[in-house]
């Protein structure tokens, strides 16, 4: 079965994003739609460990080529960040229970992958050409706080700053986040999100988690060849 893929352009078409509808977090951006598709395909092997952690390796391996099912204009943030910041037409309504459970299983796999990467990479990360860039702990903090203190507010969660940065706090956040999304998807919230939807929230949370996990892998000073010039 082909991989249902969406192309999202920024409002000024400065950058584009290609992402899979069926595999939350498998999403890459580039200057053009063609390059975004090429990069998405190049990340197929990098996404496989997440499918494996979710118990879906066989399904993922059987997936066919990328198939564009929608070509859309996103937001100004798409141009600025090269990231999808709005739901596609397929991600508008509530998810079925089976769809929700599948999405959450893959999101949990993304979390597990992030945690495993964070535990094995070097504390100091390879710097950029001008010597800038965050170290491991700052990447971890940013990733967790963005989800727990920003994304999760869309489904009514509010926690003190930094509360999810401890092991117990992170476990509690993830449990509460999933439950809040489940309740929201079931229609138990009176106040809808302004522009996001549950399918998008799951996809965006998985993407943000994996994007920074892959960043840590790419900048790991303990990885083979890490001391070679880039």
List each model region and its residues.
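Short, contiguous alpha-helical
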Residues: 4-33, 37-56, 115, 123-171, ...
């Amino acid at each position: 079965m082909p991989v249902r893929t969406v192309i999202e352009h920024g409002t000024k078409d400065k950058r584009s994003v290609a992402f899979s509808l069926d595999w939350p977090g498998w999403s890459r951006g580039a200057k053009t739609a063609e390059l975004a598709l090429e990069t998405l395909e190049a990340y197929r092997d990098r996404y496989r460990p997440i499918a494996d952690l979710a118990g879906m390796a066989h399904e993922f391996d059987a997936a066919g080529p990328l198939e564009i099912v929608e070509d859309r204009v996103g937001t100004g943030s798409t141009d600025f960040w090269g990231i999808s910041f709005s739901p596609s037409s397929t991600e508008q309504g509530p998810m079925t229970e089976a769809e929700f459970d599948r999405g959450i299983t893959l999101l949990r796999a993304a979390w597990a992958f992030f945690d495993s990467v964070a535990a094995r990479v070097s504390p100091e990360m390879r710097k950029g050409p001008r010597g800038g860039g965050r170290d491991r702990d700052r990447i971890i903090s940013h990733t967790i706080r963005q989800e727990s203190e920003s994304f999760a507010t869309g489904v009514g969660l509010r926690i003190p700053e930094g509360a999810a940065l401890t092991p117990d706090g992170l476990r509690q956040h993830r449990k509460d986040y999933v439950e809040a999304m489940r309740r929201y998807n079931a229609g138990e919230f009176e106040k809808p999100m302004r522009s996001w939807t549950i399918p998008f929230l799951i996809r965006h949370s998985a993407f943000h988690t994996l994007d920074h996990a892959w960043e840590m892998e790419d900048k790991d000073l303990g990885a083979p060849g890490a001391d070679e010039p880039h």
